[in-house]
Amino acid sequence: MASSEQKPLPVPSLEKAPEKYDDEAEEPTGLANIAETLEKLREEPLVREQNLKQMRDWIAKHPHIRRCRTDARFLLRFLRAKKHSFMVASQTLERYLAARMIHPGWFQRLDIRDPELSHLADIGFIYPLLERTADGCKVTMTDWGLLDPKQYTIEHSNRMHILLAEAYSDDPLVQCAGVILIFDLKHVTLAHQSIVSLSVLKQVAKFINNGLPLRCQGVYAVNVPAGAMWIVNGLVSFLHEKIRSRFAVFHDFDEFTKERLDRQLLPKEYGGKVPKSEHMKAFREQCELYRDKMLALDEMEIDLDHNEAYSRHAMLDDIEGGAVGSFRKLDLD
C-alpha cells in the first residue's frame, strides 16, 4: 500500500490505564473475500469490542507491564494474529514486550534517518512490494546478501525486519490477510555465514514463534547457495510446526513464481512490472510517515525480573539449553 493512501497517525498514548482509550481503527477493505477472511479470524463487531475491553482491563491490572500502547490499532495486531483468542493474544503481547526489552538492538531507535538503517534501505536490503496478492497478503523481499558482513551484523538485519514490521503492522489488511516473506539468498557468501550463529537463530525463532503479532502466510528462500543451507535448516528447525509448514526453498525465481507467486507482483528486475526503486521509495516514505510513532515504542516497558514464562531468564535460555539437540537437517527441496 503506497504511503500516499494513508494519513499520518498521531503518536499513541503509552499509559497502561489512560482516562480515555483510542478506539479509532480503519476497517479492512478492498478485498473481495474480506468477509471470509474475518470469519476465519472469528472477528465480529461484538467479539472485537469485548476482546479490546478485556485486553485493556488486563493490561491495566498487569503486575509487570509498566507502559504499553492500548489503542485499538495496536491491540488488534495481537487479537487478529491469534484469531481473537484472548489468552493467546495476551501471552503474545507479554512476549512481544519482553523481546523489546531483551533485544534493544533489534527494537530500539527504529528510525529511517539513522545512517545505518537509511543505507540498508537505500541499497534495497529489504522492502515490501507495492501490490498485494489476490488474497490480500503483503509481500516483503529481502536480498540478504546485500548486508555487508564487514560493516553490519545479524542485529542490523533483525532491526531492518522489525522496522518494516512496525511500519506496516497497524495496517488492517496486513493484520487480517497476513504477510508473505521472500528471502533472495543469491548474494550470500561465506563471509555472511560468519556473522550467523545457532544461538542467534534460536532467539530470532523464539520471537517469531511466541512474540510476533503477524499472520505469516508463507516464508520462502530462493537462490540458496549450498553452503548457506545450514542457516536455513537451523532457523527452520527452531520454528513451530505451523510456521515450518509454510516454509519452502526454491532453486530460482522461475520455479518460485510458477508454484507460489504471480511474477507481476515482483520488481521489474525479477520479471515484474514496477522497478525495484519504486518499491524501495514507497517503503522509505512509509517509514517517514510512521517515524514518530515507531520511535515512541522505545518507551514501552515490562518488568522481567520474576519467574513467569516471559521473564528475562526464560526469554534468554541459550543454545546450551537444548538448541543443538533440536537442530537437524531438514528435507526442504
Q: What do these predicted ranges mean?
A:
Residues M1-D333:
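Basic, amphipathic alpha-helical/coil surface patches used to engage anionic, phosphate-bearing ligands
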